[in-house]
Amino acid sequence: MKTANSKITKGKYGFFLTVPRGEVRILQLTDIQIIDSDQMRTPDRLVEAERLKWTADKVWHNAYRYVKEAVDKAKPHLIVITGDNVYGEFDDSGDRFREFCEYFEGLGIPWAPVFGNHDNQTKCDVISQCEYMEGLKNCLFMHGNVTGNGNYAVTLVRPSSEPGENNGEGTHFSPLRTLLMLDSHGCLHHPGIRTDQIGLCREALKEVEEKTGTVPPLFACYHIPSYEFCLAAEDAGYQKADDFWAKYDIGVTVPAKNGDFGKRDDPQGKVGDNSAFMEFFKANGGDGIFVGHYHKNSTSILSGGVRYTFGLKTGLYDYHNDDMIGSTLITLKDPADATGAPEFTVKHLYTAFSPDDPA
């Protein structure tokens, strides 16, 4: 299967995405969280101002214009969407979910979504929604036979030579990076990455090694972070791990270290337990984790060789800070770059729109 100058190959535990030579751009979108107030289950669920601004005819203004802006800026090879894509409680018909999928399919760019804690709340059959995404041309999604909805790997590969360069043996492929796409739960189950999910990750990496000869560095993408983000912030000296109400703006109210950046304006505590996953992740070359869930947190902090990043919230649905809307660009450097540049960089792309701008 080919899409947007990329080739998608499906494996047992995930996908292999062939990307061109040069730097590779991954765009993270998170907490788009489309709300259709016309589908409120009870008349008092939203206040009147929310009901009026979140009707079905305003989805472009509240969400998709921000997605288009981000895609136009980043020109990504891959889009990852880290949960709370459509607020299921406000989409019992499934109409907004299908529109969401159709919009991203129409971009012609491979996109890899995970579930957040609100996606599962629809009265629609979630398994059918998973099957719907699995059948889409550009969507890299796999339900996975473990706890949750959507547990799989995406491995970025590129030709290590042009056809015919390898003594007539044809094109060889080398892996650049494997992304572990995981359901962090929080709706049907308590948050946290489970033992069986770690087992699936282990099998996925075996498949990567079998097909490419090695396991590349890892990213992890999921919705709800646990205590690992608090510990990273403490290690960097920005807060005490147990100070769940800490607020700061790195480089503004506290000095930045190691290229860190972003703002913490949402309380975050210990929800779930990802300690076993973190042990596995680090032992297998993991060095970047990308999450969402906390709409007013945008910190990106390096700790113990891993960069912990809250993606910038995309769009205007649900609570947010108007000056913290946009997307997050992850750039993998060209392996041919011998300048000593970091293996990857992370940058928030802030929107140029005002919430009051006309659609």
How does the language model describe each region?
Residues 38-42, 124-127, 230-235, 322, ...:
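Short aromatic-enriched loop/helix-cap "lid" or pocket-rim segments at secondary-structure transitions
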Residues 33-38, 87-90, 113-125, 187-189, ...:
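Active-site environment of divalent metal-dependent phosphoester hydrolases
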Residues 2-8, 12-16, 20, 153-158, ...:
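Binuclear metal-dependent phosphoesterase catalytic core
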Residues 1-95:
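N-terminal active-site segment of His-dependent metallophosphoesterases
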Residues 74-77, 172-174, 178-180, 189-294, ...:
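His/acidic metal-ligating clusters that form di-metal
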Residues 2-18, 96-216, 328-329:
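Extended active-site neighborhood of metal-dependent phosphoesterases/phosphodiesterases
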Residues 31, 67, 79, 84, ...:
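Divalent metal-coordination and catalytic microenvironments
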Residues 23-36, 176-185, 221, 307-313:
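Active-site-proximal beta-strand elements of phosphoester/diester hydrolases
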